[in-house]
């Protein structure tokens, strides 16, 4: 008995996994596998088929064929026994009995074939033995990994305790109030928002509504200036943390892979934060939630906007904002409960119900107005993406094009196309922009840094092995822009007390929250 090759192929003859047990060129094995589907008659129940030189012993597995190529002198009964063994091994390693599942487990299947067949002859093994041989677990290796992992965990615990002590000491130093703003909170919605304490000349305009807000951990809103120069109690304890760092470096030098916690500490967050240069900053942001049908039409087009205010100095909190916006169909505003709604609806002025209470100050933004737009159609999309996959022979040709609206200049555009499981990157034939293949998630990312008047449209063309057209959906799109649909802006800031209007800056941005073609 001589098994020339053991293979898994599709019904069209596409080779997914193949292991040769004799010297055979790539061209010859490709020719033998491609010729097999033509030899198998439809409706026949045979388990083998012969040609002048070789014999095919096969077994259908859903939409695939498990195939043994042998010489004509081999024992057909032993060939069938080998085929049965391999058919039991495939479900043990492949997550699903289709092209994608087999390709994902290609190497595991090859190793299993090698354990089951040696030099073209079947080994006297069972499925359980093959699995054991492929795993090749080592008790010594497991013990070594457990010891090293325990050392790493112990080191991380020491580091966490030190970080906690440092953060606690910094928090204790920042407890003295400045102007009464003891706990600045980060609001997330209209229903309830709160900042406790009081500013000079009056109480803050926002009450304490705990269901809405959450405190910024370990971060005082306005620490006293003297605390900046205060020495950290027990600061010399950092030398112990330095020893733990040296221990981690020694582990890395021995080739150990150490997974550090990626969550930054509060100290790192504060050091990387760039404070605004102007005393008052207004941020206007709109988020897109769009679902476009691949055949045309929009199933969801939702825009949610927010106007947020950040004031650095307590004395600048007694102000009102004059705004204006474009008349957009379906635009609905909603103000914070402590904002004067009558003043906003009649004159488009954002001001507090009680003018004697200031807006809160600090490093956090306070949302004042929110809005929603829901009555736009497909013609208002900032970016339209069309995908045209077509199967030709053993390949799928995919053409993707985008068309951008004249209303927006889009920055950092990324179009992510899902692909079938591939051994190699797709063959990109033409592209306007850059591309990157994420092999881990099997996604092709098409990137354009800027879409403006010079490139309102563009295309991408690539090829992959034959696949179902639905494989390339849903397509995810991400981008940002410096103008918004509502075109809302603050035209002036009016002080409620004597003095000149404070200087302010304004930031407008349109971002994608969920933008897909399905």
Curated annotation (Swiss-Prot):
Entry-linked PROSITE patterns: MHD (PS51072)
Highest taxon of source: Eukaryota
Cysteine pairs bridged by disulfides in the record: none
Membrane in keyword set: yes
GO cellular component labels: COPI vesicle coat; cytoplasm; Golgi membrane; Golgi-associated vesicle
Gene3D superfamilies, alphabetized: 3.30.450.60, Mu homology domain, subdomain B
Annotated localization: Cytoplasm; Golgi apparatus membrane; Cytoplasmic vesicle, COPI-coated vesicle membrane
Ranges where the MHD domain occurs: 277-518
Keywords: Cytoplasm, Cytoplasmic vesicle, ER-Golgi transport, Golgi apparatus, Membrane, Protein transport, Transport
Membrane topology, as annotated: Peripheral membrane protein
Biased composition (Gly residues): 195-204
Biased composition (Low complexity): 220-229
UniProt-annotated stretches for the region Disordered: 165-235
Annotated SUPFAM superfamilies: Second domain of Mu2 adaptin subunit (ap50) of ap2 adaptor, SNARE-like
One of the protein's GO biological processes: endoplasmic reticulum to Golgi vesicle-mediated transport
Compositionally skewed regions (Basic and acidic residues) per UniProt: 165-178
UniProt cross-references to Pfam families, sorted A to Z: Adap_comp_sub
Family classification: Belongs to the adaptor complexes medium subunit family. Delta-COP subfamily.
Protein task: The coatomer is a cytosolic protein complex that binds to dilysine motifs and reversibly associates with Golgi non-clathrin-coated vesicles, which further mediate biosynthetic protein transport from the ER, via the Golgi up to the trans Golgi network. Coatomer complex is required for budding from Golgi membranes, and is essential for the retrograde Golgi-to-ER transport of dilysine-tagged proteins.
Subunit-level organization: Oligomeric complex that consists of at least the alpha, beta, beta', gamma, delta, epsilon and zeta subunits.
Name this polypeptide is given: Coatomer subunit delta-3
Species name: Oryza sativa subsp. japonica
